C-alpha cells in the first residue's frame, strides 16, 4: 500500500501494489505521475520492505525509513493499511520519526545472512545433543554404561561409528542404537556446517575491519555484531554519539538535587549492547589500563556498574572510529578502481 502527498502535505492518492519488481515499477511510475518525487518513506525496510528499499535506491530515489507510526493519529482514526500508508507519507514529508535506512547491498548484508544461518544451525546442534543425552538416560544399561565416562565429542564419534542392525529395528536395543547413531551423525554434520560458516564469517569480518579484531578482547562474534549494527553505510550515523545511542550505551541522566549520575540505557540494539558488554568484561580482566580506569572511577564514588557503563561508552567510541576509518578506505579504493 502506497500514499502520495503534495508539498502542502495533502494526500493526493492511495494505491495498492504487489511486492514484486513489476509491482515496484508500477508504484514508482504511479508516484511520479503526480509530479517530481522528493523522497519515499518505507516501513520495515529490514524485512518486508527490503525489496522496495533496494529498488528505490537503485532508481536514485532518496529513501527514509519510517521508524514509528503516529500514535495520536492511530488512536484517533484506528489502524488499517490505508491509514498506515498515509501516516508513512506524512512522516516522510515532515522527516519526523524517520531515519536513514541501512543499505543492504554490501558485505555486511552477506555477514548478516550468514550469521542468521549460523544461529539456526547452532540451535539445531544443541537440540540434537539434548535429544542424544535424553535418549542415553532411558537406554538399556548394556548400552548406557560404556558411555558414561566419555567426553562430548568422544561420545558423539562413538555413537556415529556404531553399526546397528537396521533390519532389527523392532527390537528395543537395536532401535536405540539406530536412533543414537542417526542423532550423532546429524550432530557431526551440523558441527562441520558451523565450522564452514565460521570460516566465511571470519573472512568477511577481516575484509571489512581487520583492525577491529586486533583490539584487546574483541573477538569474531563481537566484532561481527558491531559491524552488523553499523551496517553497510555507517556514514548515515551523524557521529560516534549516534552509534553509542544505537548500541544502547549512551548515558541517560538520572540526577536529582546535588546527586549527579546516569542510569542504564535500556534502548538501542541489545545484541550490540551485549557485544560491547562482553568486550568490557574481557578488558576488565585482561587490560591493566582498563583496570586502572575502573579503579579510578570507583575511588571517585561511582559504583562498579556505573564505571563499566562509562567504559562501554568509550568502547563504542573506539569501535565507531575504526569502522568509519575502514569505510573511508573502502570507498576510496572503489573510487580509484
Which functions belong to the PLM regions below?
Residues 1-337:
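A detector of single, family-specific signature residues
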Amino acid at each position: 500500500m502506497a500514499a502520495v502527498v503534495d508539498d502542502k502535505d495533502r494526500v493526493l492518492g492511495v494505491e495498492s501494489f504487489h511486492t514484486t519488481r513489476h509491482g515496484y515499477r508500477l508504484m514508482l511510475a504511479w508516484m511520479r505521475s503526480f509530479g517530481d518525487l522528493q523522497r519515499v518513506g518505507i516501513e520495515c525496510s529490514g524485512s518486508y520492505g527490503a525489496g522496495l528499499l533496494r529498488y528505490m535506491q537503485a532508481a536514485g530515489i532518496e529513501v527514509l525509513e519510517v521508524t514509528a507510526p503516529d500514535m495520536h493519529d492511530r488512536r484517533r482514526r484506528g489502524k488499517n493499511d490505508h491509514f498506515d500508508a498515509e501516516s508513512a507519507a506524512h512522516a516522510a514529508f515532515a522527516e519526523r520519526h524517520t531515519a536513514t535506512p541501512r543499505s543492504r547491498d554490501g558485505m555486511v548484508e552477506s555477514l548478516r545472512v550468514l550469521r542468521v544461518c549460523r544461529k539456526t544451525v547452532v540451535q539445531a546442534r544443541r537440540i540434537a545433543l539434548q535429544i542424544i543425552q535424553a535418549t542415553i538416560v532411558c537406554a538399556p544399561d548394556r548400552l548406557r554404561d560404556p558411555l558414561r565416562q566419555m567426553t562430548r565429542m568422544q561420545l558423539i564419534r562413538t555413537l556415529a561409528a556404531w553399526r546397528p542392525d537396521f533390519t532389527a529395528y523392532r527390537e528395543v536395543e537395536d532401535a536405540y542404537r539406530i536412533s543414537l547413531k542417526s542423532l550423532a551423525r546429524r550432530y557431526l554434520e551440523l558441527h562441520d556446517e558451523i565450522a564452514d560458516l565460521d570460516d566465511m564469517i571470519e573472512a568477511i569480518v577481516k575484509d571489512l575491519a581487520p583492525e577491529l579484531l586486533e583490539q584487546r578482547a574483541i573477538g569474531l562474534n563481537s566484532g561481527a555484531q558491531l559491524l552488523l549494527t553499523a551496517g553497510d553505510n555507517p556514514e548515515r550515523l551523524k557521529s560516534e554519539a549516534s552509534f553509542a545511542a544505537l548500541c544502547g550505551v549512551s548515558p541517560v541522566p538520572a540526577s536529582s538535587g546535588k546527586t549527579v549520575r546516569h542510569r542504564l540505557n535500556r534502548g538501542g540494539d541489545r545484541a550490540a549492547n551485549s557485544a560491547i558488554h562482553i568486550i568490557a568484561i574481557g578488558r576488565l580482566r585482561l587490560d591493566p589500563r582498563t583496570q586502572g580506569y575502573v579503579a579510578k572511577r570507583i575511588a571517585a564514588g561511582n559504583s562498579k556498574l556505573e564505571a563499566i557503563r562509562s567504559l562501554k561508552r568509550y568502547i563504542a567510541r573506539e569501535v565507531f572510529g575504526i569502522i568509519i576509518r575502514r569505510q573511508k578506505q573502502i570507498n576510496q579504493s572503489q573510487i580509484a578502481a
